[in-house]
């Protein structure tokens, strides 16, 4: 006779089919969540891009008293959980720019000697830049946290200029 000859075996097959169907449906829903999660991560990665803070890098480089309106708008559009990381990267880029302009100096001395001559002044400039970067969300009057970033820095200049 057939597989579905008794009502009990028909019920078992229907139950098994329903269980497999629900398991398959759950797996598809789970996959969608993971894919959505990947998309969120990708979007978050893009929103953490320090290139989106070009006006803020200008603020960090030029040491203005207040960031420009454009800088604050760029920061406002950025995802709150990415702001400090992007600000730190923008600070790194602005300091890389500053040190590359050092190498173009015409005084003929090697770069690390020029840095050592400026020594304390350069360290203070770097500390002030870090403070400006840490306070940037607050200076832009952003409502969401974080309103202050914790940026830990090690001076590149003390490492570079260690020996003669």
UniProtKB/Swiss-Prot annotation:
Which superkingdom does the taxonomy of this entry point to? Answer: Eukaryota
Ranges for region Disordered: 92-137
Q: What does UniProt give as the signal peptide span?
A: 1-29
The molecular function terms of the Gene Ontology recorded here are:
nutrient reservoir activity
Feature: compositional bias, Low complexity: 92-107
Write down the glycosylated positions: 138
UniProt lists compositionally biased (Basic and acidic residues) regions at 120-137
Give each disulfide bond as a residue pair.
none
- Keywords, A to Z? Allergen, Glycoprotein, Seed storage protein, Signal, Storage protein
Under the heading PANTHER family, the entry gives:
2S SEED STORAGE PROTEIN 1-RELATED, 2S SULFUR-RICH SEED STORAGE PROTEIN 2-LIKE
Task: Give the UniProt family note.
Answer: Belongs to the 2S seed storage albumins family.
Quote the protein name from its UniProt record.
2S albumin seed storage protein PINP1
Q: From what organism does this protein derive?
A: Pinus pinea (Italian stone pine)
Which gene does this sequence derive from? PINP1
């Amino acid at each position: 006779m057939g597989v579905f000859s008794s009502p009990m075996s028909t019920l078992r097959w229907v139950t098994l089919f329903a269980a497999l169907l629900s398991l398959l449906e759950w797996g598809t829903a789970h996959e969608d969540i993971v894919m959505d999660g990947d998309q969120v991560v990708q979007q978050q990665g893009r929103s953490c891009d320090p290139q989106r803070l070009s006006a803020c890098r200008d603020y960090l480089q030029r040491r203005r008293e207040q960031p420009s309106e454009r800088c604050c708008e760029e920061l406002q559009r950025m995802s709150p959980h990415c702001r400090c990381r992007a600000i730190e990267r923008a600070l790194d880029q602005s300091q890389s720019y500053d040190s590359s302009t050092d190498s173009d100096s015409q005084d003929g001395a090697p770069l690390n000697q020029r840095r050592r001559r400026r020594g304390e002044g350069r360290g203070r400039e770097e500390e002030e830049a870090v403070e400006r970067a840490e306070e940037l969300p607050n200076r832009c009057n952003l409502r969401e946290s974080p309103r202050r970033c914790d940026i830990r820095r090690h001076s590149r200049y003390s490492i570079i200029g260690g020996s003669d």
